[in-house]
Amino acid sequence: MTFPEYLISKDILPGIKVDKGLEDFGSGEKLTLGLDGLSERLAKYYALGARFAKWRAVITPGNGIPTDDCILANAENLAKYALKCQQTNLVPIVEPEVLMDGSHTIDDSFEITSRTLNTVFDQLENHKVNLQGIILKPNMVLSGYNCSYQADITEVAEKTVNCLSAHVPAEVPGIAFLSGGQSDEDATMHLNEMNKYETDWNLTFSYGRALQQPALKAWSGKSENVEKAQGVFIERAKANSLATAAGL
């Protein structure tokens, strides 16, 4: 039994990251690569058991950036990737991430995220991507790491839901937030607060560090800590599961 087959036997659908990383785009900006040979790779991954794919675009706030050109170039690549996925019977996770790095305010984040989502969905529609067959993986609307004013949980939830309501079509079935470097507690509580709102979509999580970091810290590479680390991971997973129903 292959690893994908084992996952499927446990009702876990496997997926794969298919972009090839970033290249410089102008001053301080990045463009995600990976369209070359993508259709052939997707067909191979589907045959191996993958049922979804992921492509991450990076949008960097800063002095005079992001530019419209960079947002558009990344949105076009996201749309081309998403269409190729659907043509191969894979569900595309569409991930336009506005980074937390920097001193930008939460209002700056709202404006940049709004511009980004508008452009992404314009390109998805231009490329005839079926919006009912994607999952959106966006950032939350947050203060930059180095901003002197850090928005609280209530403000983050309100601004994020307002931004999504204005710019994400109702046909999109699900939104799975990235944690983007938030603490594990903040990522969970922001999700919990957002799920107190009535929205058109299922709001859930697609966290890396916010799920894994506490378990990795508990483990610390020591075999005697494995059971403890597993318990920590289950605890974080349960908390986020409850947050999807505003249950905390």
Language model: regions and residue ranges:
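Alpha/beta catalytic barrel-like cores
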Residues: 1-48, 59-61, 149, 153-159, ...
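Glycine-rich, proline-tolerant flexible connector loops at the mouths of alpha/beta enzymes
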Residues: 25-27, 57-70, 98-104, 145
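Glycine-rich anion/phosphate-binding loops
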Residues: 28-43, 66-81, 114-115
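Short acidic/polar active-site loop segments enriched in Thr and Asp
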Residues: 51-53
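Conserved, mostly hydrophobic/aromatic
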Residues: 55, 94, 136, 208
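Catalytic core of soluble alpha/beta enzymes
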Residues: 100, 104-171
